[in-house]
């Protein structure tokens, strides 16, 4: 395994409610990052087919027709569309953590697929608890989604979605899995001019949630976020709402294991890819001071119990 790598964090606008359009754009970004020499590429949350911000503004009844289209344009993990992306990853020879709305039977999940340089999905996980009104359209990830670190030729790569970064115990379990590079997948988060809007759902706070992972975990963090431009408000079903008046919402960044910002940020309404040349040995330098699952821990006094069992809706008597 090479210790010196180039990593990439995507900041881009989805192709709203357009499955094939989203696949094509995702492939184009993979190809672009690979041409720049990237080895590991991180994508925003539900980049395909975009984050459904309208669930924060409309009632379920008002939103139903749009969500029906959203369901149709979400991607199945085993599908021709995913096969196209896997083929592009294989051709590029990179490692990708892809964020998308996963359609499985009659339910949607906020998913991340970890795709290696052979085009193989080596890890697949779902957000364990959708945030607030997300629960109206997305299901919960089960115990298998607690495993969020993949051992790859480019190091041990992890991923979490959005406010999963606020889940203290989930972060701690990730650190116990010995993460090197963490992909922090986010939607667009808009600067607010609405006094009632919770401050902890702002770019400043959400960026801070990811920043903490770099320092606690002594790992590199690729914060990848969506943007939303004003001309696409209607497509995203948020036209005329106060909380999207300040368009953009991008806040992508790459952090070092010491918590340093390694790149200059893009403008909130700017599409692009952030790149950083990294050396995984930096992790061990940081851990000399701070290893919260090692020498700087007291498991005899404080420890974590993990249940990786996947709960199922149907059990058979002879399995009990």
Curated annotation (Swiss-Prot):
CDD domains: nitrilases_CHs. InterPro entries: C-N_Hydrolase, C-N_Hydrolase_sf, Nitrilases_CHs. Its EC number is 3.5.5.1. It is an enzyme of class 3 (hydrolase). Optimum temperature is 43 degrees Celsius. GO terms for molecular function: nitrilase activity. It comes from the Eukaryota. Optimum pH is 7.0-10.0. The active site is at residues 45, 127, 162. Residues 5-280 form the CN hydrolase domain. Keywords: Hydrolase. Nitrilase that hydrolyzes preferentially benzonitrile. Belongs to the carbon-nitrogen hydrolase superfamily. Nitrilase family. This is Nitrilase.
